[in-house]
Amino acid sequence: MAKTVFITGASTGIGATTARTAARAGWNVALFARSEDKLAALADEIGGAALALPGDASRLADQEAAVARAAEHFGGLDAAFANAGRGMTTAGTVEGDTDDISSMVDLNVKGVLWTGRAAIPELKKTRGTLVLTGSAAGRRHIQGSIYSATKWFVHGYAGNMAEEMREWGGRCTVIAPGMVDTPFFDEGKPDKLHPQDVADAVMHALEADPRAAIREIFLMPQT
């Protein structure tokens, strides 16, 4: 029976590339993001192994409903990839727009928490894996960066969840990439990491032998 992974932020970039990669590896993919059109197009591209689940990752109710539907549709859940996230238009505690700050914190912090809260009950049944998109920015101090601070949270949460989940045979991995060439940036970054690099890291964490707990994968561009 094919395994199933729930992916937030699945419509573009790292999420979409991970979905394609997982499907090629024989996984079912539950695709969660706000863009219904992009999700539908990706699900059509992947075929029967994909299920489009539109919703807002910063809303717990949306994620809980999506996880429940995915588990019912595919017969369970083996992994969840909390990938949804965003940056700020103008960085800085004083300079940044307050609504922009709130929206980013809701998605980058609460969105990750809600993926864990929604998915853990299903993952306990399969001794599954929770994967989080962290960042190289969450491993060092960056002057005035609130985005970086949200990623510090992700890294701390990942470590805490790894300890909690090991009690019932589950695993938690944080993927910490440097700059990735995705729609996150207005201009292309051809000399940086490709979304495929991150997708490959996610799959390595998901498909590692159960005896191995991969806590963190740190990726940086070679050039």
Regions found by a protein language model. Give the residues of each.
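The beta1-alpha1 cofactor-binding region of Rossmann-like NAD(H)/NADP(H)-dependent oxidoreductases
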Residues: P54-A65, T98
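C-terminal helical subdomain
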Residues: G170, V174-I175, K189-T223
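Active-site helix of classical SDR
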Residues: G116, T150-K151
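Conserved glycine-rich cofactor-binding loop
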Residues: S11-T12
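Substrate-binding pocket helix/loop in short-chain dehydrogenase/reductase
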Residues: A91-T93, D97-S103
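Residue(s) in the substrate-gating loop at a strand-loop-helix junction
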Residues: S135
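Conserved glycine-rich Rossmann-like NAD(P)H-binding loop of the short-chain dehydrogenase/reductase
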Residues: A25-L42
